Amino acid sequence: MVRQIKILPKHSIGHNFSGFDKSYPEELYSSLPIIEYTQIIDYINLKTQRDYKSYILYMIIFAIFGLLPFLIALIFELFRSSLYKNRFERDFDNCLKQINELIKCRNVTFSFKFTSKIRKMQKLELIISYQDEQPKKEIVGDFIVSPEGRNILVLPPAPLDLINFDQLYLSSSQSNKFNKSKKSNKINDKTPILNNNNNNNNNNNIINYCKTKINYNNSERKTNGLKDDNFYGFKDTNYDKDLYNFMLESEYQSMIREFNTVLVRKIDIKKQLIFLLVSTILLIALIGFILIIPAAILYSKKRSHYYTHLYNDLNIMVHKYSSIYNSRGITISYCFENSDDFNNDSSPLINILIIYPKAPKGSPILTNFTNNTHQWILVPTSPNAIAPYFTILNNMAYNNNNSIIENNFNNNYNNSNNNNNSNNSNSNNNNNNNNNNNNYNNNNYNNNNNQVQVYQTEQTLNYNI
């Protein structure tokens, strides 16, 4: 008997497609390993995520000046929309064919369909079909408590007979179709995402790096119901579980809260708005024609001053946290919600981007079940490896620093004995000894800093099983 699981895509606006969430359906526990499922969703998102820029505003402008330009623009828009969706379906279908060919030994197949006659991205479903005859595996694991007090179910390590998905990514990097879709995924960033000297290596960067977007907090703006120029900060609740190997949830929330503490503010333009309102009323009475000009200038200057300080502080915070997490391969950046806001350089619709490497082989996978409880699960890909990957790098760096300091200490000790035995040492030898002593002190200072940092990291990761 064949059963099906339907997975809805992430929320998106208009024709944009944001991909699928990597929450694991527990019905597949007997059929498809978690690590393979997450790699499949990664590949599907890589091939299908894209943005669609609508020309509806130009259509409205054309409608003001005449019906004929409006009809021409409408036909052109419908043609572009249909072409966009046809290409999307073609890429999605080719993507799923490659995946199904690769995992046919699992007796699991992936397909998709639109649930409405009008092809809307919000009505798209990813369908997973699997055989129900095979014996069910019971989900067995131990619970751990994260530093944030969250219960995480640790499952047994991933099986050894895993399917290698690297060939899918390699074929994607050499595909011309991917280059076309990458252009449509262009994000307008104020700061560069990656410092690349070779622009021809963009495909490898997309494959080797991931990014997660932290959306602006729009709840206050929605409650007001009016256009609001104030910036209300970022949401700190949507922790991306793919960040587990590079940044803890507590570090993530602490970073976003500091961003909000520094950046959240309100424009003090009450007097300017009152002045503008009074001038508008007088303008209607043909008296305030002269006053409307200074009112508009004051309003524009106040608004420009607000956004200048906002973006300056935002650049400072981005540089600060990029420096903090640079050793883990993480880059912090930001982007605007759409190109118009980017060009105007005065928009509160700002999203933070966290760019991080793909988790290396052997690192654990953090996701959750797609049931009513949304239980977080942690799957080690090697025995007893549940700690985030960056802690291993910190420990390696700590051990390397210890060996370097020990060698410097022995060298300095030998140099001091040689200096005591030689009475005719020249000034060059004295300078060398001073440099060695300075290097020894600097290494000791760096070692103390690294020791404190590693100790704090290990204390943060002290899970209670």
Curated annotation (Swiss-Prot):
Domain of life: Eukaryota
Residue spans crossing the bilayer: 56-76, 273-293
Topology within the bilayer: Multi-pass membrane protein
Record's GO cellular component terms: membrane
Record region (Disordered): 177-198, 411-449
Compartment list: Membrane
Keyword Metal-binding annotated: no
Annotated keywords: Membrane, Transmembrane, Transmembrane helix
Protein name: Uncharacterized transmembrane protein DDB_G0294619
Lineage, top ranks: Eukaryota, Amoebozoa, Evosea, Eumycetozoa, Dictyostelia
